Amino acid sequence: MTRTVDEIKYETPSSWEHKSLDVAEDGRRLAPHSDTARPKGRIRRSMTACHTCRKLKTRCDLDPRGHACRRCLSLRIDCKLPETTDRFQDSAAMWPDATSAIPSIEERLTSLERCMREMTGMMRQMLDHSPGFANASVPHLTKSIITDENASMEGSPSSPFLPKPVRLIQDLQSDFFGEAETSPVDSPLSSDGNAKGAIDSKLSLKLLQTFVDHFGACVSIYNLSDIHNDMKAPDSLLYNTACLLASRYVPGIPTSTVHAIYLQVRHAVVNILWEKPPLKYETLQALALLCLWPATAQKEPPMDSWLLSGISINHAIIALDFLNYAPSEVMVDNETAAQLRLWNTYCLTQLHFAVGNARPFHIQQRYLDHCPRILEHPAATLEDARVVAEIQLYLMTLRLQSNSSRMRLADLDYEEIERWKREWAHLFSGESSTLELSLWFCQTLLHRTAMRLQPRSDRLASEVLQTSRLIISRFLQIRYSTALSLVDQVYFIVGYAALNLCDFNLMDPLIEQVQMFLLHLSPNEDHIAYRFSCMVAEFKRRCGSAECNDPSSTVKGSPLSSYGDSRKMSMGQAPFMPPLMDGMIEGYGFEQLMPEVMPSSFPDGILNGMPVTGLAAYRSATL
């Protein structure tokens, strides 16, 4: 190899010879005193390196922003490097743009995280606009709702591909009964004794006691003394709500009076929700009751519990002090336990109608973490445990529905739900327990969601049919006095199960049994049970009429059932069915019923004379 030395300039020999040199004792010549003894073209390299670079025999470059070399910084080890001015100048000269060109590790990680968030957001937008993956963008949970289990549930979007049982039932009622119109408010709870339909003090006391016995526990009202005198004023929302709910147990109250109370409550709610926060505690109690029983008077448009609970939750976050602290920082005393019970009611109602309407769920995880704390209180009840268990169940349902890959697998059993069943199995027993109804309802929704991706799955269709029969069979065993105080969500669960039976097996005897049970259960024609009974009967009649008129379009032309008519049982396939009264399930005894408050028959026009508009008009695609 030829070495190029063109750029190296040496001084003239004459000058070189006249340089003074140091001579060692052994005669060897040492370096001259002057720097000119070194050739000017040689690169001036730093002879100082840290211990690591010297050991690895690698280049040691100092980071201008720190006191360590780049290799030690990247390896995250201590850099044993003497701090010298020459060293810093050498590195700075060789890396003049190091500050701007090579960021630190923390800056790199921050940049990568930002890019990942942007990419994730773009992917979600793409999935939202893709019909095949639309239900991948539904709420995530427990840590909040989005596709990943550790993502946030805040502002979770809804999906048009999810079943909407509550919306479906409300649409069917509007179709069968017509749109309701709001009437002017005329309060019967007036201090004026001459007012039309006014409730006197003796009757109001009876209503309050009935309310305490059947409804008060869910908002920590166990005695009449828990309702203070200022809460018993005619303009008190809690007082009006208590009288409204208790009226179903007092058949002597005229329907017009109950209707007027309902209108006044609606009017008061509209005004209160716009009041400056924080709201009074008794007002929050009344709002929680109305979230649980929004459809008290069915002649009026029902209050939207999803919207009502959402606004009430915002007021509760401001009014309830314990929500301002971490769960571990809160001592669960009697007052906090009552507030936790109220908060859990709001969370559960928001979940009920977020799932039932396929709407977003907005409660942040840090607020949801407070829900199980009520079980730490020594006076916690089984009902408190049921509410906590149901909150967890609906959160899991939202998470599973939002996971399109899990829905495509079309599992009949989900590991999360099986764990939940083992944890809360002790709450399934008991005549008044409705936890199993919620479990079967959530399983039905998961199977219905999976059927959108597996439209011809016989396994899923069979599972929906079986689960719907379990719901109705269990509901028919509930006693009359208990059934009247059930929250409206239970009636939506039972109504949806009955519609599923009409969809899969029109000849199932449970359809007529639950229809009659709802009819005899209702204290008046405004009660939700009465309207649901009429709805099931009319839905079944239209299904049967449409199939008889056009057998070829039985299910194939229905947007509801895209899995074909093979799931339907014909008259020839149906097993022998005993008469209705002989086939009643044990526990459904007519001695429980109150003849004086039973409507004698369906109103004219509900079941007769209504035109059959075709299967697609009333069998909603969202069932």
UniProtKB/Swiss-Prot annotation:
GO-annotated cellular components: nucleus
Listed GO biological process terms: positive regulation of DNA-templated transcription; regulation of protein catabolic process
SUPFAM superfamilies given in the database record: Zn2/Cys6 DNA-binding domain
Residue ranges: DNA binding: 50-79
Keyword tags: DNA-binding, Metal-binding, Nucleus, Transcription, Transcription regulation, Zinc
Top-level taxonomic group: Eukaryota
Gene Ontology MF annotations: DNA-binding transcription factor activity, RNA polymerase II-specific; transcription cis-regulatory region binding; zinc ion binding
InterPro entries linked to this entry: prtT, Zn2-C6_fun-type_DNA-bd_sf, Zn2Cys6_DnaBD
Location in the cell: Nucleus
Pfam family, one: Zn_clus
Family according to the record: Belongs to the prtT family.
Reported function: Transcription factor required for protein utilization and degradation. Regulates transcription of major secreted proteases.
Protein name: Transcriptional activator of proteases prtT
Source species of the chain: Aspergillus niger (strain ATCC MYA-4892 / CBS 513.88 / FGSC A1513)
